[in-house]
C-alpha cells in the first residue's frame, strides 16, 4: 500500500497538465499555484530524461534534490514520521533519520516515475487555506485510458516564513502517508529505541525487496 501510495504522490507532483498563472513570488503564491508549479517542473524533467523514466537511482536522486526537496518541509516530515521518540534523538541521530527517510522515499519514487508519460492532474474543489496551513485536493487520471478511476489525493501544506508553502503530508485515497510511516516507525522506536529504528531503516534501504513484502 505504501509503495502504491508514494507512486501516486510522485504522479501527482509530476503529472499535472494544468496551465499556470503568471509567476508569483513564494510570499504571494497560493498553495494551488505552488502545487501546479512544482508539478509542471517535475513533469518537464521526467519527459526530457529517459534515465528518470527508467528509475535510475542517480537521476532520481538529482530530481529529488533539485525539485522535490525544496517543495517539502522534510525536517518536519521526518520528525512527524518518527513520532515522540524524535525528541530523544541526538543531532547526529536526527541527521541519520533524515538521510534514511530520504533514501526510503527515493527507492519508492524510482518505481513510480515511469508513470509520468500517461497521467494528468486536476485541482478539485473544497480546498482549505487559513494562511498558515492549507489543504489542496487533486485528482490524477490516465490520458490513454480515461475510463480508469481517478485517484484522489490531498496535499497538506504549511506556509513557512520567507519560504512560502511547503508540503508536509499527502493523503492518497484516505491514507495519510507520513502518519502511516509514523505508525511503523513509532512502534519500532518505542520497542527498540532510536538506534533500533535507525538499524531497521538502514536494513530496509540496503534490502528494499524486504520492504516490498
Indicate residue ranges for each PLM-predicted region:
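Cysteine/selenocysteine-centered motifs that mediate thiol-based redox chemistry or coordinate metal-sulfur cofactors
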Residues: 198-213
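Positively charged n-region of N-terminal signal peptides that target proteins for export
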Residues: 1-4
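A short, amphipathic edge element
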Residues: 113-126
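Early exported N-terminus immediately downstream of N-terminal targeting peptides
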Residues: 28-109
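Bacterial N-terminal signal peptides
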Residues: 8-18
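Extracytoplasmic
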Residues: 37-39, 55, 63, 69-72, ...
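Exposed beta-sheet edge and beta->alpha loop/turn motif
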Residues: 42, 127-195, 200
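Signal peptide processing junction and immediate N-terminal pro/mature segment
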Residues: 19-26
Amino acid at each position: 500500500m505504501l509503495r502504491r501510495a508514494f507512486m501516486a504522490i510522485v504522479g501527482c507532483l509530476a503529472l499535472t497538465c494544468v496551465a499556470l498563472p503568471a509567476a508569483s513570488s513564494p510570499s504571494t503564491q497560493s498553495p494551488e499555484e505552488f502545487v501546479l508549479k512544482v508539478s509542471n517542473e517535475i513533469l518537464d524533467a521526467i519527459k526530457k530524461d529517459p534515465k528518470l523514466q527508467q528509475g535510475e537511482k542517480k537521476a532520481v536522486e538529482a530530481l529529488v534534490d533539485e525539485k522535490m526537496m525544496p517543495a517539502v518541509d522534510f525536517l518536519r516530515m521526518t520528525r512527524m514520521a518518527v513520532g515522540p521518540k524524535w525528541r530523544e534523538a541526538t543531532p547526529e541521530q536526527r541527521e541519520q533519520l533524515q538521510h534514511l527517510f530520504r533514501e526510503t522515499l527515493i527507492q519508492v519514487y524510482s518505481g513510480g516515475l515511469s508513470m509520468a508519460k500517461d497521467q494528468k492532474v486536476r485541482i478539485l474543489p473544497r480546498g482549505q487555506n487559513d494562511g498558515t496551513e492549507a489543504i489542496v485536493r487533486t485528482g490524477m487520471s490516465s490520458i490513454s485510458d480515461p475510463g480508469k478511476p481517478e485517484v484522489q489525493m490531498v496535499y497538506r501544506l504549511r506556509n513557512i516564513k520567507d519560504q512560502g508553502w511547503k508540503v508536509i503530508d499527502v493523503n492518497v485515497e484516505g491514507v495519510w502517508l507520513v502518519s502511516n510511516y509514523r505508525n511503523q516507525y513509532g512502534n519500532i522506536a518505542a520497542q527498540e529505541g532510536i538506534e533500533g529504528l535507525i538499524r531497521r531503516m538502514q536494513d530496509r534501504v540496503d534490502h528494499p525487496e524486504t520492504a516490498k513484502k
